[in-house]
A protein has these predicted regions:
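C-terminal substrate-binding subdomain of Rossmann-fold SDR/epimerase-dehydratase oxidoreductases
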Residues: 32-35, 199, 219-364
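Histidine kinase transmitter module recognition
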Residues: 65, 203-204, 324
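Glycine-/small-residue-rich active-site loops that bind phosphorylated ligands and cofactors
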Residues: 68, 93, 104, 202, ...
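A generic short alpha-helical patch detector that favors 3-5-residue windows
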Residues: 85, 207, 305-309
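NAD(P)-dependent short-chain dehydrogenase/reductase
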Residues: 140-145, 149, 157-158, 163-254, ...
Length: 364
């Protein structure tokens, strides 16, 4: 039995944003670990979606609600009495943030305020993790990876709202949770961290403006894969890498509050591919199973500003918790193709999802 399994068995964990792509993977992992899972979110953001495909509503305490509704959120915290809270609810898309900046700030900033307020008012909570993004940093197009103490100042409304979410967390931590000590005036201890992950990939992502879902949609419609920014470099990683890292941070800081802090979660340098390389790898793996279906076509669309080069330095989380990437990009893409071939064949996706979770957890 892994450390995560020993720790999470029977633990009450509340996830905000549990109906999203990453949230649904988080639910599946926690169920595999034996946790008691509750979630608070709007309806799933896409149709189809992983949450419904895995029939998660039947397996967890799922509560529908807007993260901006503080009174409703307080009710759910009081009802569920969680020990651990993972805050993932967000408006997560850069391009959408240009269309809906006010909504993006409202969800990503005030949503964080509301969750932290509920953590403050709920005595059962001992560990809180705020999931932000690699895009919280002011982007200088550096070759080196960004470190946790670099300037927080995202460019676009999405990235900047997540920078603000980091600052909100820091303020609450210092104002109400005793700063680094984690000791509140009441004597209660709460460990608080933020985690900044790179771009996640995996089966069950059906979002717009994401490269792998675009690839799947293209091949299933017998169309070429249109690549709008082939030379933009991102810290791509399988969704299970950050999900299990979040759970490790939540576990370890509860055991030892001095480990609470801010952490980057990104892949090794050799796995920081540009979008063109990522699509080429997808085509190679897909065509190995379904020959000649995947074809790439570059077509810049003159869309709004997005960073060209973005890497994370994950030294801190590796040295603090021993966390390092388990799957290289070859292994990641093989599992994405495996999952989507199963899905497009009309199979129940629970077995392939659970198989991949077990493979990941059991790998040293």
């Amino acid at each position: 039995m892994s450390q995560l399994e020993e720790f999470y068995r029977g633990k009450k964990v509340l996830i905000t944003g549990h109906t999203g792509f990453k949230g649904a993977w988080m639910c599946k992992v926690l169920l595999e670990l034996g946790a008691v899972v509750s979630g608070y979110a709007l309806n799933p953001p896409t149709n189809p979606n992983l949450f419904e495909l895995c029939k998660l509503k039947e397996r967890i305490h799922s509560h529908e609600g807007d993260i901006r509704d503080l009174d409703r959120l307080k009710e759910i915290f009081a009802m569920e009495q969680p020990e651990i809270v993972i805050h993932m609810a967000a408006q997560p898309l850069v391009r959408e943030s240009y269309k809906e900046p006010v909504y993006t700030y409202d969800v990503n900033v005030m949503g964080t305020v509301n969750v932290l307020e509920c953590v403050r008012l709920t005595d059962s909570v001992k560990s809180f993790v705020n999931v932000t993004t690699d895009k919280v940093y002011r982007n200088f197009e550096w070759e080196r990876g960004y470190k946790e103490d670099d300037i927080l100042n995202g460019f676009d409304p999405y990235s900047n709202s997540k920078s603000c979410s980091e600052l909100v967390t820091s303020s609450y931590k210092n104002s109400f949770f005793g700063g680094e000590s984690g000791k509140m005036d009441s004597g209660r201890f709460v460990a608080i961290s933020t985690v900044r992950a790179g771009n996640v990939l995996g089966g069950g992502d059906f979002a717009t403006d994401r490269i792998i879902p675009d690839c799947i949609r293209a091949v299933s419609a017998s169309k070429p894969i249109v690549v709008r920014n082939p030379y933009s470099t991102r810290p791509y990683q399988h969704v299970l890498e950050p999900v299990c890292a979040y759970l490790t941070v939540a576990m370890e800081q509860l055991k030892d509050i001095t480990k609470a802090g801010n952490y980057n979660i990104g892949p090794a340098d050799e796995d920081c591919l540009n979008t063109g390389e990522l699509v080429n790898l997808f085509c190679e793996k897909w065509n190995a199973i379904r020959p000649n279906e995947a074809v790439r076509e570059d077509k810049p669309d003159g869309g709004p500003h997005e960073a060209g080069l973005l890497k994370l330095d994950s030294t801190k989380i590796r040295e603090t918790f021993g966390i390092k990437g388990k799957w290289n990009m070859d292994e990641v893409m093989e599992r994405i193709v495996e999952w989507n071939v199963s899905y497009l064949s009309g199979e129940d996706v629970n077995p392939v999802t659970e198989k991949q979770i077990r493979e990941y957890i059991q790998k040293p």
